[in-house]
Amino acid sequence: MIAFRFPVKTLTATRLFAEHIAQAYPTQKAILFGSRARRSEHDEGDADVAIILKGAIGPFIKTKMAMNDITYDILLDTGIRIQPLPVWEAEWAHPQNYSNPYLLYDIARDGIDLASRFNEF
């Protein structure tokens, strides 16, 4: 894979998001996926971030909506819209049991662990 530097706004927004999520949820990791991870994003495109959560599988919609509340403040601060995807560690470990296993396969293949990129600041 060719190394590249993320745009500062993307790093700022995803770092803020990951920090806020880690304060609210037991988080294993945050993974950027989709167009920003593939470097094919548009100026107005969102940043898709999978949040791998520790513990028992919880209520998806309730968790996603709570994460969306956090993303709104980050949008106002950075101009970057984040689309969170909560995934529990059991789902991540066994994607074949997830409602959309191919999405998790794609994230595992193309996604970028954000913790490894935050040192670019």
Residue ranges and their predicted role:
Residues M1-K29, R38-S40, K54-F121:
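Catalytic core of pol beta-like nucleotidyltransferases
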Residues H42-G45:
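Short glycine/proline-enriched turns and hinge-like loops at secondary-structure junctions
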Residues A47-I52:
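Short beta-strand->loop micro-motif that forms the acidic, two-metal-ion catalytic signature
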